[in-house]
């Protein structure tokens, strides 16, 4: 009986802590966007985000940060990594902070409203129980990086470098590359922020969010 109560207490504690972290990340995300992005349309974009699952959605269905709030957490991680890369390359005041905020915070906007929760049977201690898991249900099959550019462009005007950076942030993992396109090489050569955005995304995914390593 005591063991069962302790298990439930631990579950409730973790649930509360996870909700607090999600709210903290949401507050941080909105603050950064409002402080660093002064472009027309940003307020409308943030208001729209409040009506979506952006702040509660996972970053993936089964890979990095496949958990509630993972998408926002990943976006913050990429933003922080991109800031550090730009400061290392150009110095603290040698890069466009607004562009970095737009790219870092919104590069995965395409994942908004694409994940659904379903149930499946899992055996625990010899007993079959139902567990929730994430599935993909994309009602706007526009691609990945290019979809984020498309969605963002409905609210704010992007510079060419911002659009290229978001469009190609997956680098060699992009499905277009797997289909034979190597245009991302041209983008990386011509637009430095595109390369840095890809590196930031990889660092966040494989260093900050690698559960096997952490």
Over which residues does each language-model region extend?
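Positively charged N-terminal leader segments that act as targeting/secretion signals
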Residues: 1-11
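Non-catalytic interface/linker regions that flank or bridge core catalytic/transmembrane domains
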Residues: 13-57
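Generic amphipathic alpha-helical segments used as scaffolds and interaction surfaces in large
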Residues: 32-36, 69, 153
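Divalent metal-dependent catalytic cores for phosphoryl transfer on phosphate-bearing substrates
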Residues: 61, 65-67, 73, 87-212
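Buried hydrophobic packing segments
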Residues: 75-82, 152
């Amino acid at each position: 009986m005591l063991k069962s109560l302790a298990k439930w207490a631990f579950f409730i504690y973790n649930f509360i802590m996870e909700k607090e972290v999600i709210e903290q990340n949401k507050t941080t995300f909105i603050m950064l966007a409002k402080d660093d992005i002064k472009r027309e349309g940003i307020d409308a974009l943030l208001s729209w985000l409040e009506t979506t699952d952006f702040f509660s959605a996972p970053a993936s269905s089964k890979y990095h940060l496949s958990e509630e709030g993972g998408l926002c957490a990943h976006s913050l991680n990429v933003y922080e990594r991109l800031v550090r890369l730009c400061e290392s390359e150009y110095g603290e005041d040698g890069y466009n902070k607004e562009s970095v905020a737009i790219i870092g915070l919104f590069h995965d906007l395409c994942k908004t409203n694409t994940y659904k929760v379903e149930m499946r049977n899992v055996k625990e201690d010899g007993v079959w129980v139902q567990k929730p898991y994430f599935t993909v249900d994309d009602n706007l099959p526009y691609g990945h990086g290019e979809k984020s550019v498309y969605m963002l462009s409905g609210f704010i005007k992007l510079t060419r470098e911002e659009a290229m950076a978001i469009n190609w942030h997956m680098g060699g993992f992009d499905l277009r590359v797997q289909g034979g396109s190597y245009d991302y090489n041209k983008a990386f050569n011509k637009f430095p922020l595109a390369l840095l955005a890809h590196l930031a995304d990889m660092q966040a995914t494989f260093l900050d969010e690698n559960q096997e390593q952490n």
